[in-house]
């Protein structure tokens, strides 16, 4: 292990020659993480975690602080970029069988949960109308837990309703969690280099490797440059593209928005939650929509690692991608027909993919055996 760390240090780590552009998203996530920590620090310097001043402090940052508008937009749009990269990173892991590197996959799924928690806490901080009501709805799900739910919710809120103590602790959590993410990311990378990364063919690449630098460094830099270009263009020309109009109004506990929805990157999980009429089962489905990824390495039954040579699984994978998008779209709509039915069907298909994974593997194994 120390020998491998030395190789990483000097950019001489042997890497498979045939890894494609889909393997670049790990380094892009590292860049996103660094940018979020830096911009977040400069925003925290000017932010005030008080329900009467939080909204005004965001206005102050965007209007009065030199380049504050840029910091705020880079941080907000950077979070969206972070999630785009992480969803592609996970999709690549599913498609090419990277999840068979179990320790790396499990640490990565834990990272995703931490990242989603951090983003949720951050969304509450501007104390806009949608921030407040999204926080109320999501944290209120804890009350669905039998016996302990109400106590846990009161403990999280710091009172009997979302108020000043809630905002203070959410700011503290939003500040501290990224350091946990950085630590776990380091562990994730160390675990990856213990076995080495996979490749599109899903074969052992020990016989065909090249140094990471300069070959893959330049390949990574190209995608990184494109990401930075997209980020800066969005910040400059469409800074409010991901914002909810409701969030430009200060939080008002007496006025409920017509339609409560979190940021776009949570909509698939929120759509699954909304599609189930029961509160407890809805909360469980919400948790399962993420944690079910932990089961994938243990339900792989195929003799072939990559989906590149598995047509049945390819069909299922692209159905999953389409389902993810449909749930995200349906979650932006009001809770009424036909959107409730669409969400329920899409949610069922979403979970079916992960249940059908071992069955598809057995079918493919039998087809290969008899040919």
Swiss-Prot record:
Cofactor(s) of this protein: heme b
Top-level taxonomic group: Eukaryota
Record-linked InterPro entries: Cyt_b/b6_C (IPR005798), Cyt_b/b6_C_sf (IPR036150), Cyt_b/b6_N (IPR005797), Cytb/b6-like_sf (IPR027387), Cytochrome_b (IPR030689), Cytochrome_b_C_euk/bac (IPR048260), Cytochrome_b_N_euk/bac (IPR048259), Di-haem_cyt_TM (IPR016174)
Binding locations of a ubiquinone: 193
Binding site for heme b b562: 75, 174
Single Gene Ontology BP annotation: mitochondrial electron transport, ubiquinol to cytochrome c
GO molecular function: metal ion binding; ubiquinol-cytochrome-c reductase activity
Annotated residues for binding of heme b b566: 89, 188
Keywords: Electron transport, Heme, Iron, Membrane, Metal-binding, Mitochondrion, Mitochondrion inner membrane, Respiratory chain, Transmembrane, Transmembrane helix, Transport, Ubiquinone
GO-annotated cellular components: mitochondrial inner membrane; respiratory chain complex III
Coiled-coil parts of chain: none
Subcellular location(s) per record: Mitochondrion inner membrane
Transmembrane regions listed in the UniProt entry: 25-45, 69-90, 105-125, 170-190, 218-238, 280-300, 312-332, 339-358
Cofactor remark: Binds 2 heme b groups non-covalently.
Any single Pfam family the record assigns to this protein: Cytochrom_B_C
Record membrane topology: Multi-pass membrane protein
Complex and partners: The cytochrome bc1 complex contains 3 respiratory subunits (MT-CYB, CYC1 and UQCRFS1), 2 core proteins (UQCRC1 and UQCRC2) and probably 6 low-molecular weight proteins.
Further comment: Heme 1 (or BL or b562) is low-potential and absorbs at about 562 nm, and heme 2 (or BH or b566) is high-potential and absorbs at about 566 nm.
The family this protein is said to belong to: Belongs to the cytochrome b family.
Physiological role: Component of the ubiquinol-cytochrome c reductase complex (complex III or cytochrome b-c1 complex) that is part of the mitochondrial respiratory chain. The b-c1 complex mediates electron transfer from ubiquinol to cytochrome c. Contributes to the generation of a proton gradient across the mitochondrial membrane that is then used for ATP synthesis.
The protein's name: Cytochrome b
Organism: Eryx miliaris nogaiorum
């Amino acid at each position: 292990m120390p020998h491998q760390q030395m190789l990483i240090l000097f950019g001489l780590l042997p890497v498979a020659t045939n890894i494609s552009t889909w393997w670049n998203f790990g380094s892009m996530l590292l860049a996103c993480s660094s940018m979020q920590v830096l911009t977040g620090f400069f925003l925290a310097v000017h932010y005030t975690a008080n329900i009467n001043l939080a909204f005004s402090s965001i206005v102050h940052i965007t209007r009065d602080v030199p380049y504050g508008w840029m910091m705020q937009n880079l941080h907000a749009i950077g979070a969206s970029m972070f999630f785009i990269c992480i969803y592609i990173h996970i999709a690549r892991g599913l498609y090419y069988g990277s999840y068979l590197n179990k320790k790396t996959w499990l640490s990565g799924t834990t990272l995703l949960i931490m990242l989603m928690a951090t983003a949720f806490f951050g969304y509450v901080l501007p104390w806009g109308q949608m921030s407040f009501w999204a926080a109320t709805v999501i944290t209120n799900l804890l009350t669905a837990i039998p016996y302990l739910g109400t106590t846990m919710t009161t403990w999280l809120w710091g009172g009997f309703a979302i108020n000043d103590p809630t905002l203070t602790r959410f700011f503290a959590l939003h500040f501290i969690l990224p350091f946990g993410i950085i630590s776990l990311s380091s562990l994730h990378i160390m675990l990856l280099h213990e076995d080495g990364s996979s490749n599109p063919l899903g074969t052992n690449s020990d016989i065909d490797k090249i140094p990471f630098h300069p070959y893959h460094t330049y390949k990574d830099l190209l995608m990184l440059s494109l990401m930075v270009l997209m980020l800066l263009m969005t910040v400059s020309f469409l800074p409010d593209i991901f914002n909810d109009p409701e969030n430009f109004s200060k939080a008002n506990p007496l006025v409920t928005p017509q339609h409560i929805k979190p940021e776009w990157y949570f909509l698939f999980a929120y759509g699954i939650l909304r599609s189930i009429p029961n509160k407890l089962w809805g909360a469980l489905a919400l948790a399962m929509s993420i944690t079910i990824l932990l089961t994938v390495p243990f339900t792989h039954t195929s003799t072939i690692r990559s989906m590149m040579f598995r047509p049945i699984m390819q069909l299922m994978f692209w159905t999953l991608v389409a389902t993810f998008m449909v749930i995200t779209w349906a979650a932006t709509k009001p809770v009424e027909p036909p959107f409730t039915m669409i969400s329920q069907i899409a949610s069922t298909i979403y979970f079916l993919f992960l249940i059908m994974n071992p069955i598809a593997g057995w079918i493919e194994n039998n087809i290969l055996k008899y040919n």
